[in-house]
């Protein structure tokens, strides 16, 4: 990412409106989007989007508008119970083909999928790409990763 100056409060307000309008349209037009909510408690410009999946029945995608970037993340699964090396190798190899997204280890060693873009790239098309990619990558990776990291639960 380039070292663009931080967005002004007015620019952030404009990006916030783009995100809010896009989310409202997604709720109406995208059957995978079940709900969205603005996080008003934190004082940050953050939204949580509830998504219905197939491999993973439901998950939430966070959009966090910062001064220089829009950060996107979703919780994928807890830390593996077994086959740790194989599990993390699997996710690291998947990172090569995730088009600007990365699997990351978060609190309590949980697995998250994250991405970010410069605020100047926030458009409806880019928001579509971010949400669509999050959906696709969770759907592609969830079951194989679960079968590795929780293998004994899948026997029988």
Listing of model-derived features with the role each one plays in the protein:
Residues 53, 62-65, 102-108:
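Short glycine/proline-enriched loop/turn "hinge" motifs that connect secondary-structure elements
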Residues 146-156:
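Short, highly charged C-terminal tails/helix-capping segments
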Residues 104-137:
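A short, solvent-exposed beta-edge/loop patch
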Residues 70-112:
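Short, internal acidic amphipathic alpha-helical interface segments
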Residues 1-56, 106:
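Charge-rich, low-complexity N-terminal segments
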Residues 53-58, 65-70, 77-81:
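Short, charged/polar surface micro-motifs in flexible loops or helix N-caps
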Residues 51, 74-76, 115-119:
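Short beta-strand-to-loop capping motifs
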Residues 96, 135-146:
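Short amphipathic alpha-helical signal-transduction/dimerization elements
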